[in-house]
Amino acid sequence: MGCTLSAEDKAAVERSKMIDRNLREDGEKAAKEVKLLLLGAGESGKSTIVKQMKIIHEDGYSEDECKQYKVVVYSNTIQSIIAIIRAMGRLKIDFGESARADDARQLFVLAGSAEEGVMTSELAGVIKRLWRDGGVQACFSRSREYQLNDSASYYLNDLDRISQTNYIPTQQDVLRTRVKTTGIVETHFTFKELYFKMFDVGGQRSERKKWIHCFEGVTAIIFCVALSDYDLVLAEDEEMNRMHESMKLFDSICNNKWFTDTSIILFLNKKDLFEEKIKRSPLTICYPEYTGSNTYEEAAAYIQCQFEDLNRRKDTKEVYTHFTCATDTKNVQFVFDAVTDVIIKNNLKECGLY
């Protein structure tokens, strides 16, 4: 009697092969799909990282898209000079030249009636004169004592260019814009044959309750910390040091049961601002127990240790730390390349393919 398979048995074998093939294909597909969650306190640079992904992995911002950011550039510039002028009153700093008091009054009038996306030569002239004033500069140097955008000096130092009638924001201008992220912003791009879905989540406390919806199936978390926040307080709670808030948040994310198998990538961001600030503002403002020198290398290494020491599962979980400057495209490109290699390795392990 021959050992032939019945039609039914053949169909069963084919079905089994198809299931195996589908499982393998699903595994490979899962290994190629990366869900990245960008977390961190407010103003830590998350949205700037997302903008860099568009510049690096897509085709950047078109001229039309850049034009749309003109409104934000002008708004950020005007709000920055207004924040400094208001702080002068609180900090009891006088203008270097008495005539600037008239300019300050004029600023509020012109800013209140300014057409969106337009900077008149009159308004630009008022802002330039104010920004050059010794009292305004003295107040700017004390910006840790009030809330001020990181991009303030970038725009205010370049008023001649950005106030031109034919001005179109550059990619760098776009990177420097600040708009508070509310809700969840999703970005898709392909890199090293991986399909990335990146989720930027609002960092202010009021936004955090929305994060939970993103947690399922996350491949990796990029947690952003602004190194330069060590001597600042929160916009939403002026009693809370920003770095302490970041540490508290990192602790809750790094040791969360949801993320037992999730790669944690720590971006210690704004290293350029930190390098400047540490020369004049001691790290002991944030860490009174710190006894090291106020050099970039030593102070940055100390902050890195403070965060990495929060990981309570060091034996099974690694935190991958990178020092970043989110406005520097080359730096972000280099770091993201290294991050992707870690993700590929860990992703393949998860799918049993490594």
From Swiss-Prot:
Record bears the keyword Hydrolase: no
Q: Where is this region: G1 motif?
A: 35-48
Matching CDD domains: G-alpha
Region of interest: G2 motif: 173-181
The main place the protein resides is: cytoplasm
Lipid attachment (S-palmitoyl cysteine) is at: 3
* Pfam families in the record: G-alpha
Q: What GO terms in the biological process aspect are recorded for it? A: adenylate cyclase-inhibiting G protein-coupled receptor signaling pathway; cell division; G protein-coupled receptor signaling pathway; GTP metabolic process; positive regulation of macroautophagy
Location(s) in or outside the cell: Cytoplasm; Cell membrane; Cytoplasm, Cytoskeleton, Microtubule organizing center, Centrosome
Name the segments for region: G3 motif: 196-205
Q: Identify the keywords attached in UniProt to this record, alphabetized.
A: Cell cycle, Cell division, Cell membrane, Cytoplasm, Cytoskeleton, GTP-binding, Lipoprotein, Magnesium, Membrane, Metal-binding, Myristate, Nucleotide-binding, Palmitate, Transducer
Show the SMART domains listed in the entry. Answer: G_alpha
Give the CC-aspect GO terms: centriolar satellite; centrosome; ciliary basal body; cytoplasm; cytosol; endoplasmic reticulum membrane; Golgi apparatus; Golgi membrane
Q: Which InterPro entries match?
A: Gprotein_alpha_I (IPR001408), Gprotein_alpha_su (IPR001019), GproteinA_insert (IPR011025), P-loop_NTPase (IPR027417)
Protein topology in the membrane: Lipid-anchor
Location of region: G4 motif: 265-272
Family of the protein in this entry = Belongs to the G-alpha family. G(i/o/t/z) subfamily.
PANTHER family given for it? GTP-BINDING PROTEIN ALPHA SUBUNIT, GUANINE NUCLEOTIDE-BINDING PROTEIN G(I) SUBUNIT ALPHA-3
- Function as written in the Swiss-Prot or TrEMBL entry: Heterotrimeric guanine nucleotide-binding proteins (G proteins) function as transducers downstream of G protein-coupled receptors (GPCRs) in numerous signaling cascades. The alpha chain contains the guanine nucleotide binding site and alternates between an active, GTP-bound state and an inactive, GDP-bound state. Signaling by an activated GPCR promotes GDP release and GTP binding. The alpha subunit has a low GTPase activity that converts bound GTP to GDP, thereby terminating the signal. Both GDP release and GTP hydrolysis are modulated by numerous regulatory proteins.
Q: What is this protein called?
A: Guanine nucleotide-binding protein G(i) subunit alpha-3
Instruction: Please name the source species.
Output: Mus musculus
The upper taxonomy is:
Eukaryota, Metazoa, Chordata, Craniata, Vertebrata
